From Swiss-Prot:
Gene Ontology terms, MF aspect: rRNA (cytosine-N4-)-methyltransferase activity
Claim: Nucleotidyltransferase is one of the keywords in the record: no
Entries under PANTHER family matching the protein: 12S RRNA N4-METHYLCYTIDINE METHYLTRANSFERASE, S-ADENOSYL-METHYLTRANSFERASE MRAW
Name of the featured protein: Ribosomal RNA small subunit methyltransferase H
One protein family per Pfam: Methyltransf_5
Source organism of this protein record: Thermobifida fusca (strain YX)
Entry EC number(s): 2.1.1.199
NCBIfam families named among the record's database cross-references: 16S rRNA (cytosine(1402)-N(4))-methyltransferase RsmH
GO biological process terms on file: rRNA base methylation
Function of the protein: Specifically methylates the N4 position of cytidine in position 1402 (C1402) of 16S rRNA.
């Protein structure tokens, strides 16, 4: 993993304020189209954000019913306003996308025909200083995607032992100076709690050797990514969410996943690859029907945005797209 893009081009689902440019929009719509053209098609956007992808899908498929899920109540309300012309065809739900099976049960939906996951942090979360996601602002150290949850980045920074902070920075941020950063935080909080993004960014910068700060973007980018992942349990939720959502995908239904760093992409690749592989034990004379692939991969590896898109929308630069189609019942 190369880490987050610089703050001027961070990983996430949109573009600099005030515009919102959905990442790889045309490709997402193209990949999902064959599954959504049938009468009565239902799609789930598990990371609704500001609703850019959802709007394009609803416009492209006049008979489509769309379930939009987001853990951020602010984003959900903005998406509701954006999607108001399609109000009779949408169900918007405040939830984490690992809850998709429960949500579908409550809506009386058995199978869906399209699944979309656009991972990472959204434009408003990065652009609104008070959310505490960005190291370019001095703001309360928050980083909660869902502000109804209690634990913040400040809670983690000020209460986790040095060993656990080191693990988070090393595993989630792939930060080679994880231990030095953790020790700097522990020393600082012994004097005064670390409460703001500015203080944390300065601590991280001072903990990293000067030679290592000369390249690779802002020195705090990996540490901030790691804390955000820990605050929001992003990877553990993704691990649960993909198999859970795929269990409700109809035959010939399609899934598209956009990820923005290698940890997300690694999980996505593993889940889709496992379900697209024949798991018949070696040595058997014939394949076992229940061990045949459930999915067919639609992308060769991870697809990248075009140079034209990244030039117009730098925040798309780190995007990686994978897609698959269900070929049999699970």
């Amino acid at each position: 993993m190369t880490g987050d893009a610089p703050q001027s081009a961070p990983q996430h689902r949109g573009s600099p304020a005030p515009a919102h440019v959905p990442v790889m929009l045309e490709r997402v719509v193209e990949l999902l189209a064959p599954a959504l053209q049938q009468p009565g098609a239902i799609a789930v956007d598990g990371t609704l954000g500001l609703g850019g992808h959802a709007e394009a899908l609803l416009r492209a498929h006049p008979g489509l019913r769309l379930v939009g899920v987001d853990r951020d109540t602010t984003a959900l309300e903005r998406a509701r306003q954006r999607l108001a012309p399609y109000a009779d065809r949408i169900d918007l739900v405040h939830a984490v996308y690992s809850d998709i099976p429960r949500i579908l049960d409550e809506l009386g939906i058995d199978r869906v025909h399209g699944l979309l996951f656009d991972l990472g942090v959204s434009s408003p979360q990065l652009d609104e200083a008070e959310r505490g996601f960005a190291y370019s602002y001095d703001a309360p150290l928050d980083m909660r995607m869902d502000r109804t949850q209690e634990r913040t980045a400040a809670d983690i920074v000020n209460t986790y032992p040095a060993s656990e902070l080191t693990r988070i920075f090393r595993v989630y941020g792939e930060e080679r100076f994880a231990a030095r950063i953790a020790q700097a935080i522990v020393r600082q909080r012994a004097k005064e709690p670390v409460r703001t993004t500015g203080v944390l960014a300065d601590l991280v910068r001072s903990a990293i050797p000067a030679a290592a700060r000369r390249s690779g973007g802002h020195p705090a980018k990996r540490a901030f990514q790691a804390l955000r992942i820990e605050v929001n349990s992003e990877l553990s939720i993704l691990e649960r969410a993909l198999p859970a959502a795929l269990s409700r995908l109809a035959v010939a239904g399609r899934i598209v996943v956009l990820s923005y760093h290698s940890l997300e992409d690694r999980i996505t690749k593993r889940v889709l690859t496992e379900l697209s592989t024949d798991s018949t034990p070696p040595g058997l004379p014939v394949p076992l029907p229940d061990r045949q692939p459930e999915l067919r991969l639609l992308t060769r590896g991870a697809e990248l945005p075009t140079e034209q898109e990244t030039a117009a929308n730098p925040r798309a630069a780190s995007a990686r797209l994978r897609a698959a189609e269900r070929t049999r019942e699970p």
